[in-house]
């Protein structure tokens, strides 16, 4: 596990993703009127003179603009940008290329810090053009990815992840290679690619230093959540249950530990209880909020599948008791997921019995081949008609 003091050596939290999280909470009905959250956000805005972002969130959250505050912050921004421009001009006239780059970088970072997204993007591109070092170029690209994560600008994120991958192939060091994996993992969570997220996160558990995105316990929490939904049971055991770095942190995250082990140890009632807690957490997370219902549904299916695979048949009553729910609830759940083809079982409501119906892999492959063959044949026939014409 990374030493705690490594956090001080990491990149600056610019933009600060915690502010994006706080702003997101204020969009939810239960937090919309939360005075403490609003005060926390306004304090951060005042401290950094974030005039552009203040205007943005007032529009998005429906707040009344404090015109005096906005005017003061804009004036501070104007003075600071003038000083930064003067420093750039002086460096261009009197100093070397490195000093010119540093002056441009300071302006880029300032524009990013105050929430002027468009100006920050332009300034970072200009700084990138004046940067020769591969490592420094990668740092600028990482900054742009963070800017994209702050605003959830998917185009900005994907373009710069692609650019970072290209630069890494040109010869990036191990620290930046690992940092890119963490950034890719975070974005994979945001777009619901949990399998990719699990791969990226598990690859960097022992080398994590991306404290500009999150602290290490939060990283481990994400890692466990995505690994549980993405990995088969044997890989979950080898990479998470037996992962010493993860287990060390889980001592301080009892809720995550109990969620993980309740599923692995087939304690389904406890699993359901902890899944409800996970649902609340994911709903309040700005990155994964759009997918929290999907995650919870897939984890329910995973729990049902794991139980059903242990039996040829079992009673609805036993299954309901295993999950700590009513027979009516489990009956509705099974009917829904069986009809959708997500569970391989059939329910005898008269006898109150659930019979498993494991698919034969060879038969499934045969049916899939026939289906693909039919599709190919139809396309060939359509193509032949076009050619004949």
UniProtKB/Swiss-Prot annotation:
Domain PCI: 193-361
A single GO BP: proteasome-mediated ubiquitin-dependent protein catabolic process
Highest taxon in the source lineage: Eukaryota
Entries under PROSITE patterns matching the protein: PCI
GO CC annotation terms, alphabetical: cytosol; nucleoplasm; proteasome complex; proteasome regulatory particle; proteasome regulatory particle, lid subcomplex
Gene3D superfamilies per UniProt: 1.25.40.570
Alphabetically ordered keywords of this record: Proteasome
Keyword Zinc-finger: no
PANTHER family: 26S PROTEASOME NON-ATPASE REGULATORY SUBUNIT 6, 26S PROTESOME SUBUNIT 6
Family designation: Belongs to the proteasome subunit S10 family.
Physiological role: Acts as a regulatory subunit of the 26S proteasome which is involved in the ATP-dependent degradation of ubiquitinated proteins.
Protein name: 26S proteasome non-ATPase regulatory subunit 6
Organism of derivation: Drosophila melanogaster
Lineage: Eukaryota, Metazoa, Ecdysozoa, Arthropoda, Hexapoda
The encoding gene: Rpn7
